[in-house]
């Protein structure tokens, strides 16, 4: 039986909104102006950055439609050891009882079996996931992801 995995940042958690509040600029603009090192340094210094992220506007719509499939949250970590606990607590707060796996983004594929489905907003993760026989759904919003997921799973109308 195929497993459904949901990425966290950009699918369930609004990383960009949370990062903008800390950085004072949109994440890409801050990174271009100050560099990737300073970007992550500022976020790492923010108390409970990941735990405090708001939900994406349509996160609950997506999750409720797939809850019966027992999805697993599969989320990438930045370098360092500061983010995993925050992400685990965030998932427990917003999606109690849902399993979460924290890993380096490049290692997400190590959790896939052939046919498993990953919903992720970062298209750059597609090749590694598909290389192991997984199905990649590029998340733009809940409606389009649910339409695509309906090819692989029975989707709840809510």
State what each model feature region is.
Residues 70-72, 98, 136:
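Hydrophobic anchor at the start of a short beta-strand
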């Amino acid at each position: 039986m195929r497993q459904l995995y949901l990425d966290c940042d950009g699918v369930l958690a609004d990383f960009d909104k949370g990062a903008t509040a800390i950085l004072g600029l949109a994440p890409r603009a801050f990174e271009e102006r100050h560099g990737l090192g300073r970007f992550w340094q500022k976020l790492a210094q923010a108390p409970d950055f990941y735990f405090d992220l708001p939900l994406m506007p349509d996160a609950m719509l997506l999750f409720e439609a797939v809850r019966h499939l027992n999805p697993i949250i599969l989320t990438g970590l930045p370098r360092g050891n500061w983010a995993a606990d925050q992400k685990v607590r965030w998932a427990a707060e917003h999606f109690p009882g849902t399993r979460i796996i924290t890993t380096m983004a490049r290692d997400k594929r190590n959790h896939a079996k052939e046919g498993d489905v990953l919903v992720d907003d970062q298209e750059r993760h597609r090749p590694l996931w598909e290389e192991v026989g997984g199905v990649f759904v590029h998340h733009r919003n809940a409606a389009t992801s649910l339409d695509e997921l309906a090819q692989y799973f029975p989707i709840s109308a809510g």
